[in-house]
Amino acid sequence: STPKPVVVTPGSANRQAAELFRAAALATERRGIPSLFVTPWSDQLPSPLPEHVTHVQRAPFSALFPRAAAVVHHGGIGTTSQALAAGVPQVVQGRCFDQPDNGARLERLGVGRSLAAGDPEAGALFAALNALLDDPEVEPAARRWARAMRTDAGEPAMERAADLVEEASGAGPFSGARPPTR
């Protein structure tokens, strides 16, 4: 059977991703696995496109990510959360805003690796993919976090998140909490 692909996406608005795609093409070729590049900006792709790489302009991440071996991306919260919900390992090459922090958080959760900002090196991306795909603890951790995002003991995840915020603040459930006084 064909191995699951590594999905590579720099986000829908990133037009400065040529080096990410070049590095990903080299890293996945070296690893011997197919890759799927998702971007509307085909001028960012290596030319000619390597045989092991498929390109699509857009894809429904909620359907695509569960079928991926890993997702390599920019670390935006939308892509990060969709990959986390799919239970798939992630490599983040964040450049700005919350992206590097999102990558660091994925590392702490045991489901991702974060590359330094700037142009990615194929060797660093190859090493990050190997670390994720060869570590027997990463895939089960990714699946656990995906389950936790869906439910926690049958309770919807958003309700559980609100309860955790209340617990952390010391307020407890809202029904018994008093609003702050001035």
Regions found by a protein language model. Name each.
Residues 36-37, 91-92, 113-115:
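Short hydrophobic alpha-helical runs that function as membrane-insertion/retention elements
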Residues 56-105:
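A donor-sugar binding/catalytic signature common to diverse glycosyltransferases
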Residues 93-97, 116, 133, 152:
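Alpha-helix capping and helix-loop boundary segments enriched in small/acidic/polar residues
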Residues 123-182:
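C-terminal amphipathic helix plus adjacent low-complexity
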